[in-house]
Amino acid sequence: MGKVIGIDLGTTNSCVAVMEGDKVKIIENAEGTRTTPSIVAYKDDEILVGQSAKRQAVTNPNNTLFAIKRLIGRRFDDKVVQKDIGMVPYKIAKADNGDAWVEINGKKLAPPQVSAEILKKMKKTAEDYLGEAVTEAVVTVPAYFNDSQRQATKDAGKIAGLDVKRIINEPTAAALAYGMDKKQGDSTVAVYDLGGGTFDVSIIEIADVDGEQQFEVLATNGDTFLGGEDFDSALIDFLVAEFKKDQDVNLKGDSLAMQRLKEAAEKAKIELSSAQSTEVNLPYITADSSGPKHLVVTISRSKLESLTEELVQRTMGPCKIALEDAGIKIGDIDDVILVGGQTRMPLVQQKVQEFFGQEPRKDVNPDEAVAAGAAIQGAVLSGEKTDVLLLDVTPLTLGIETMGGILTPIIEKNTMIPTKKSQVFSTAEDNQPAVSIQVYQGERKIANQNKQLGRFDLTDIPPAPRGLPQIEVSFDINADGIMNISATDKGTGKAQSIQIKADSGLSDEEVEQMIRDAEANAAEDEKFANLAQVRNEADGRIHAVQKALKDAADKVSDDEKSSVEAAISELEAAAKEDDHEEIKAKLEALDNAFLPVSQKIYADAGASAEGMDPNQFQQGADNAGESNQADDDVVDAEFTEVEDDKK
């Protein structure tokens, strides 16, 4: 088994890491940063991912997708999805199966398909660093993700060309990273994870058992639709209201203005973590018949806190429930770990400190800890690391609907996984030939108030009075937190394996089609990158040869000059077309035409009479390109991004 990388697929930013020896390496992307914006843009038949997508978001808001993780595994009619529709500039559409998808240029895309583009970027980042192909990964998800959301995340990995060896919960991954440097003694930690789109809290016990670190999750709770994006939205709503009050113009319907507001709000929020006030200044935000309008608003830290205090307070409820479920008191918590970029907000830190009665630790990087923990779990799965044991739990109760529409639990929340539990059911009518079982996940007593995972039918039950058939149904949750069901008719001994026919999610055929699409795009991307490379080579060669001709004008005959200039013209014409081989051929023709000239130049200079390699003229241009890459990467990034999107 090769390296198993760890990927934190975040709502706002993503991160990739790998275990090297006994240390975790957070891998920098092609732009030189350790985290990558979880943004995907579709522009002129090109897919941009990360920073390049973020840079053009203001001018392409309808085709720039961000916070797609909030839609993964969700139904279009979910209240939280309906709320998001009014908050994002891109179109959220209803798929044929009722799922929430997005629509770009009239084409519907599934959230796992979009998330796969981010995973591909992470995969390529790791491959560039390791110098080898990467096919296996551990991917993290919010602890409170349900079965559909976990399966959709695995689908995204599959589309990206990754075998997702394990799905692990984000707070658990952060605890693994924290525990790496904590070698002695037992401790109980609370992981408070407030990311871009989700909130989780987990109570985790770390024990030293015969030299092996054992991480046991005692309880977890959270909210999969509460995060930094909501803090941004609260600030955006305030700015829109202030502008309406000042200019009597509503910016809500202007997608370009709203995208500029989003960027400004995010920037202001970050600045207010260290400053007491900041100014949002957006000239020419819009215009009407009276002329252009400018938005200038000064925001204080206290104003931001008043706008978002309710959001912070919402995180306290899950903290209380997690402690109760774990059966421990606040005083039993040894350390509090903050994870997720939103925890940098002073108000969040203050409220967490007040709740747990202690200052949270500052030695865990909130942006990188989750990816680091995923990399540690990857090393465990590959056999590279053997002194860590992870015992996680299922965050939500699993059960079925019984008479009266009540949810009958089969596996209670916070049950350690993997696990398998069974319960015996029977028929409700005489001679009933089949039973239909509705499977739900959630904490509500009324079955249909929970997330329906699907249904299955057990058929061919022999005729018998009601209540007599004994049908044992087993719920089996694997280490990823994903469920399978089997059933046995105890009267006949007939066993049957049941696959949940989910009402939502991608079918195997859809996933396979998306993989084929990704592979086709990969070929196109590679062709585009190769074409760009050979065009750059042609451009550099033409420049170098023209300079040499000018410098050696007195040594070159008219025939030689005409021959070289004709070759240059043919190469310039070829470079405007899309034929890679033709450009290469014209490059070679220019080299051959220039060879007699180069021999003259170097003979006169006392160099070897064998002539020079025309590529030497190109060397300076190549080196110049390398030196620029570390600066602004405005030019180079476009080509880098194409390579990053190889599928």
Curated annotation (Swiss-Prot):
The keyword RNA-binding does not apply. CDD domains: ASKHA_NBD_HSP70_DnaK-like. Disulfide bonds: none annotated. Residues 615-628 have a biased composition (Polar residues). Keywords: ATP-binding, Chaperone, Nucleotide-binding, Phosphoprotein, Stress response. The keyword Ion transport does not apply. The modification Phosphothreonine is found at residue 198. Induction: By stress conditions e.g. heat shock. It comes from the Bacteria. Belongs to the heat shock protein 70 family. This is Chaperone protein DnaK. It comes from Psychrobacter cryohalolentis (strain ATCC BAA-1226 / DSM 17306 / VKM B-2378 / K5). The lineage of its organism: Bacteria, Pseudomonadati, Pseudomonadota, Gammaproteobacteria, Moraxellales. The gene is dnaK.
